[in-house]
Swiss-Prot record:
Molecular function GO labels: large ribosomal subunit rRNA binding; structural constituent of ribosome
Keywords: Ribonucleoprotein, Ribosomal protein, RNA-binding, rRNA-binding
CDD domains noted in UniProt: Ribosomal_uL14
Entries under SUPFAM superfamilies matching the protein: Ribosomal protein L14
Subunit description: Part of the 50S ribosomal subunit. Forms a cluster with proteins L3 and L19. In the 70S ribosome, L14 and L19 interact and together make contacts with the 16S rRNA in bridges B5 and B8.
Superkingdom of the organism of origin: Bacteria
GO CC annotations on file: cytosolic large ribosomal subunit
Protein name: Large ribosomal subunit protein uL14
Cross-referenced PANTHER family: 50S/60S RIBOSOMAL PROTEIN L14/L23 (PTHR11761), LARGE RIBOSOMAL SUBUNIT PROTEIN UL14M (PTHR11761:SF3)
Role noted for this protein: Binds to 23S rRNA. Forms part of two intersubunit bridges in the 70S ribosome.
PROSITE patterns xrefs: RIBOSOMAL_L14 (PS00049)
Transmembrane segments: none
Length: 122
């Protein structure tokens, strides 16, 4: 469950290391974001020679949460931390590699690129 001011790790090779959620997109009163939801983020920490700069604002899709996601068969998939993948204005991933596992819930037409780049799909 991601809300405003939540700190997330970055699961791609854009050069950003940590992000802060500044808005949950999808309705004016929407408070929380889960896996597969789009959020507005600010870059808080960057690696040298990265593609993004500190302080820049991007869209991002949440790919892992500590809260996890409940499946229809009753299973619950949780992760050690919260992670997101940076997106451009057209909601396409900026990076060319994805690090760590992602869940099957991302297998929509919008995020098939992320699923295909991921090393493991749970």
């Amino acid at each position: 469950m991601i809300q405003m001011q939540s700190i997330l790790q970055v699961a791609d090779n854009t050069g950003a290391r940590s992000l802060m959620c500044i808005k949950v997109l999808g309705g004016s009163k929407r408070r929380y974001a889960g896996i597969g939801d789009i959020i507005k983020v600010s870059v808080k920490d960057v690696a040298p020679r990265g593609r993004v700069k500190k302080g820049e604002v991007y869209n991002a899709v949440v790919v892992r949460t500590s809260k996890g996601v409940r499946r229809a068969d009753g299973s619950l998939i949780k992760f050690d931390g919260n992670a997101a993948v940076l997106l451009n204005a057209k909601l396409e991933p900026i990076g060319t590699r994805i690090f760590g596992p992602v869940t099957r819930e991302l297998r929509t037409a919008r995020f098939m690129k992320i699923v295909s780049l991921a090393p493991e799909v749970l």
